Design a protein with these regions (language model features):
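Phosphate/adenylate-binding glycine loop and adjacent helical scaffold
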Residues: 2
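Basic nucleic-acid-binding interfaces
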Residues: 17-47, 54-58, 62
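Alpha-helical and coiled-coil interaction segments, frequently adjacent to or embedded
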Residues: 33-37, 58-61, 67, 91-101
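Short, compact, well-ordered microdomains
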Residues: 46-84
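Acidic, metal-coordinating catalytic segment for phosphate/diphosphate chemistry
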Residues: 73, 80-126
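Conserved Nudix-box catalytic region and its N-terminal flanking loop in Nudix hydrolases
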Residues: 130-170
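Unchanged
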Residues: 154-248
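Charged phosphate-binding loop/patch that engages nucleotide di/tri-phosphates or the phosphate backbone
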Residues: 244-266
Length: 266
């Protein structure tokens, strides 16, 4: 039986005290336990849940085991489930064993952050684009056979922002002002060493930088990248979810684009 651990509510934020809830064996079991308490998935921080103080006794009554904050951190680190991140960043999800278009497999950490990662680690960039009415720009990737936000690999010595701007123009014809792009998160890739071929991986370059851009125009004109392929489209929230919900990056997109409801206090 999987043990769920919790520390006493001692962490102040947003005018409340909070506990941390972890599993040292299974993230899936942790999600199930939190859902049983009525804690929204939005409370998940990539390797633990932040639990408001008013849920603490309920968690204990449901089978969580109390421990100190220090012991809880030790158990999380020893479990291999810890999602490392910089101070101020927010872990969203670890996607494990994802097969990429080049045939390689990777574990992918999705992290929310208002700061760019170190330039030399960034191998690619993407940008979530919204028009003034809140519609989302989607482009079709023939290589990946899926809809998504404009993005791709860096070329030459271009900056990550220039990378995102170029990809948006190539894939949709939309010319973005680099000043409109703001960093909102990143995807950290760890390639499965048992994958037969390294694909396009370069050691030390493991980050896809994610930006967002909010435009002041309604549905700016876009054009198809290549004849015979589906053209880019402006879509509403529901359509975005229907087309992209199965993509590995969806949990990060949902958080960046505020497509999830925030937790409601009792």
């Amino acid at each position: 039986m999987v043990t769920i651990w919790i520390d006493p509510p001692a962490w102040p934020a947003h005018g409340r005290l909070w506990s941390h809830l972890i599993s040292d064996e299974s993230i899936a079991e942790l999600h199930d336990f939190a859902a049983g308490l009525g804690i929204p998935r939005r409370g998940f921080e990539g390797d633990h849940y932040d639990i408001p103080a008013e849920y603490y006794e309920r968690a204990l009554a449901s089978g969580a085991v109390e421990t100190t904050g220090r012991d809880l951190l030790r158990r999380l680190q020893a479990s291999g489930l810890r999602l490392p991140k910089r101070r101020g960043d927010k872990g969203i999800e670890r996607v494990t064993g994802w097969t990429l278009a080049d045939g390689t497999r990777a574990d992918i950490d999705l992290i929310l952050s208002p700061r760019e990662m170190t330039d030399e680690r960034i191998f690619a960039a993407m940008v979530f684009v919204q028009d003034v009415g809140g519609r989302h720009l989607l482009t079709w990737s023939e290589r990946r056979q899926e809809w998504g936000a404009p993005g791709g690999w860096r070329e030459g010595d271009e900056s990550p922002v220039a990378n995102a701007v170029r990809e948006a123009e190539e894939e949709s014809g939309l010319v973005l002002d680099p000043a409109e792009l703001r960093p909102v998160g990143y995807e950290r890739f760890r390639r499965d060493p048992h994958t037969p071929a390294p694909g396009l991986w370069v050691p030390g370059r493991d980050i896809l930088q994610v930006y967002a851009a909010n435009l002041s125009a309604h549905r700016p004109p876009v054009r198809v990248e290549e004849r015979g392929q589906p053209g880019p489209e402006w879509v509403e929230d529901v359509e975005l979810g229907e087309r992209c919900r199965d993509s590995f990056w969806w949990p990060l997109a949902a958080r960046v684009l505020a497509l999830e409801q925030p937790p409601q206090p009792e």
